[in-house]
Amino acid sequence: RRDQYPRDRDQYSMIGRDRDKYSMIGRDRDQYNMYGRDYSKSRQIAKAVTAVTAGGSLLVLSSLTLVGTVIALTVATPLLVIFSPILVPALITVALLITGFLSSGGFGIAAITVFSWIYKYATGEHPQGSDKLDSARMKLGGKVQDMKDRAQYYGQQQTGGEDDRDRTRGTQHTT
């Protein structure tokens, strides 16, 4: 496998101007690395100062929020304890009212949707799912007719409506 791959990178020679162009890139990179070290160090210091400033200000803001929350809870807790016999049932009642209104609205929308579908089906339009309903109606109608025929056959067999040869034991009439 090693024989398949060239060992040196200069197998494909470049045209003279391309070789000069690419050789300049390497030299520019070396010059950038010599001068870029100071630049990257000052950039790292600027990043660190910015991060410390942003982090510190966010830490102060979160501390103020925590202190404000603790003070608000300290003030509100006695009020909540005093008014809890009134507030808890009131909140439960409000929750039940909201649940009732939302559910009745949902049921109303569902009813309007169903009535709209029935209207479209009754007027001859073909709403979505009507083909399944027609198929189920045809299957059910076929089963009803089959049961009706069987009931009529067994009713005639019990009342003696068939020929004498069919009434004997062991013979069955099939349709």
Swiss-Prot record:
Region span, Disordered: 151-175
Transmembrane region(s): 56-76, 78-98, 99-119
Main location: other
Region (Hydrophobic): 48-119
Family statement: Belongs to the oleosin family.
Function per UniProt: May have a structural role to stabilize the lipid body during desiccation of the seed by preventing coalescence of the oil. Probably interacts with both lipid and phospholipid moieties of lipid bodies. May also provide recognition signals for specific lipase anchorage in lipolysis during seedling growth.
Stated name of the protein: Major oleosin NAP-II
